[in-house]
């Protein structure tokens, strides 16, 4: 995927290795967490600093994928598919699990690429949002991006889950915003996709595994 997207060439020029997560580490959860054990890629756990660089996109299961959802990528292998199954059709349960993983990873910095965002159904369409945002609080960043595209926070399960467990700052009035104000960058025509369940069917898991093998063969 890195080769096909052009990232591999840029990374090689800059001397940056692209790593496939191969080993996971069990992380002890906090008492109020949903599960008894969490697995995160060993490379993430061993890193001195974690910088989270999500692309700002609409999402057909969670409405938006920004800072918190992107950190689900720190879960190695096909464990992500099993976690989808574990959550069933409960979007709030899935949102809470995403928040818990985000808290465990604890990135020191998040930079959200919203220069050319993605909106709409299916594979999505490009949307020239024209913003680049950054911060140290992934909840605050998700909350601000909800405001930018007009998604009420009470309808975004990730923000509600963060509020429930007391992680991050979800109150817009308590978030310090530097640079352009929200009124300067907010839009009213961002298209959200039709929602689908968060659980994966066994058929989808099998087809995903086959697609993963195919991508590895042509990479």
PLM feature segments, named:
Residues 1-219:
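N-terminal and secondary-structure boundary signal
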